[in-house]
């Protein structure tokens, strides 16, 4: 296999050059070299826009006007539980959407997740099954500030870069 170094820097406020330098130093300290990259997500808006348009044309995304405070109030997860989007904006009418936008709320865009169990085998965790709608809810693909969300970008990049194995924490399965 190959090691691909991708700098996931969509959040420009939190992405600083010293963090990128630290990642590269860590690779060197561990005696690792990357075969391809570094690639920077902030350079790939065109690819993310194409994927976004693909989803939109198929009716798979919809506008969401919920704030973080709204989401926490609706879900009220207990400590250690993750926030699951309840689908509040999933079925808003055009009139309801227009009223929210008239009040100044700009929507984020969410991917409509299916109400079905998805199963796969993870090399580290073993067999894994999850109902995305129930366990995760519809997730963001574009934020209200029009920046593309990590969840969209990482999938587009994995496909474009031929990534088929990723080591991440179980919380990101």
PLM segments and residue spans:
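Active-site cores that bind ATP or allylic diphosphates and position pyrophosphate for catalysis
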Residues: 68-173
């Amino acid at each position: 296999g190959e090691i691909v170094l991708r700098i996931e820097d969509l959040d420009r406020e939190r992405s600083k050059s010293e963090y990128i330098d630290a990642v590269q130093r860590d690779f060197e300290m561990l005696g690792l070299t990357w075969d391809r990259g570094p690639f920077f997500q902030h350079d790939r808006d065109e690819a993310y826009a194409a994927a976004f348009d693909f989803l939109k044309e198929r009716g798979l995304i919809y506008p969401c006007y919920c704030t973080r405070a709204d989401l926490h109030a609706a879900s009220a997860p207990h400590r250690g539980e993750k926030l699951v989007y309840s689908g509040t904006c999933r079925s808003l009418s055009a009139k309801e959407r227009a009223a929210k936008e008239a009040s100044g709320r700009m929507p984020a865009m969410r991917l409509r997740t299916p109400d079905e169990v998805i199963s796969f085998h993870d090399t580290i965790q073993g067999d894994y099954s999850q109902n995305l709608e129930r366990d995760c809810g519809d997730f963001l693909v574009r934020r209200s500030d029009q920046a593309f969300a990590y969840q969209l970008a990482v999938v587009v990049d994995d496909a474009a870069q031929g990534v088929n194995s990723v080591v991440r924490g179980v919380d990101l399965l």
